[in-house]
Amino acid sequence: EVMESLSPAQNVVKIVLDELIELLGSTESKLVLSNRIPNVIMLVGLQGSGKTTAAVKLAYLLKKQGRSPLLAACDVYRPAAADQLATLGGEIGVPVFRGDGEHPVDIAKGAIQEAVDHLRDVVIVDTAGRLQIDEQMMQEAVDIKKAVKPDQVLMVVDAMTGQDIVNVVSTFAERTDFDGVIISKLDGDARGGGALSVRQVTGKPIKFVSMGEKPDSLEPFYPDRMAKRILGMGDVVGIIEKAQEAADAEQLEAAERMLREGFTMNDMLDQMKAVKKMGGMKGI
């Protein structure tokens, strides 16, 4: 009876939604870490894709989960790249191994030894951004992978990358055989349609999406929510989860009081502060 009550247009939307969810992977693909200490996570991607900020956000997420991460600054080419990572790492209380003046492979290996010496259980290797046509830089990524044998290699992909994303991810998949994808800058105008290409072309799962600039803006990837976003249907569940994280015991008590006594201007101010805590209207 429910299906019969839908209009032809609604039926088409439902069919497209189901197919999109299937294309994007059906279920959440979690980050899998091994029992060895330290675990090593290596990030690769194009120049300007947002690897450094993604590395910091991933470190923050792992720290919240009870891990003790260490960031490795292996980008020796971009001016002040190590300084940027050190600054961002300091803001979230995660140390950064720089290995000033060394080769990226040596820095990555040194970071692992640093983690062993200081009881850090996860090393996140932030590599230099590269072009898929730059053979020397691509080989460097391969060399780093061979040297540190990472548990996970994650490719960071800009959500606003155009149609060339197919060639980009194909090249990286062939050379680095990455394990999963982080979609960055999804808080912009792009709805994430490029994510479809990544999953279809490589068969690699999308692990996380970055929804903003703040350290806590890295979220697990849910195919059903992304499919709804692409179709312009919004992510209601995601908004509810953000509201639950932003709400504290006092706010819950205030909500119960509002139901009993009514809504005041002070209550409106509290609600506006809560929305701001969630990242503002743009973050929602």
Model-identified regions with their sequence ranges:
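Conserved phosphate-handling catalytic cores of large alpha/beta enzymes
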Residues: 109-112, 120, 132, 136-146, ...
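Primarily NTPase-proximal linker/entry elements flanking Walker-type ATP/GTP-binding cores
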Residues: 1-74, 81-101, 107-117, 121-125
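Conserved Walker B
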Residues: 76-77, 101, 127-129, 159-160, ...
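Short beta-strand segments
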Residues: 44-45, 126, 156, 210
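Alpha-helical transmembrane segments of polytopic integral membrane proteins
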Residues: 121, 125, 141, 278-281
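Non-catalytic, charged/low-complexity accessory segments that flank nucleotide-binding cores
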Residues: 1-23, 29, 36-39, 100-102, ...
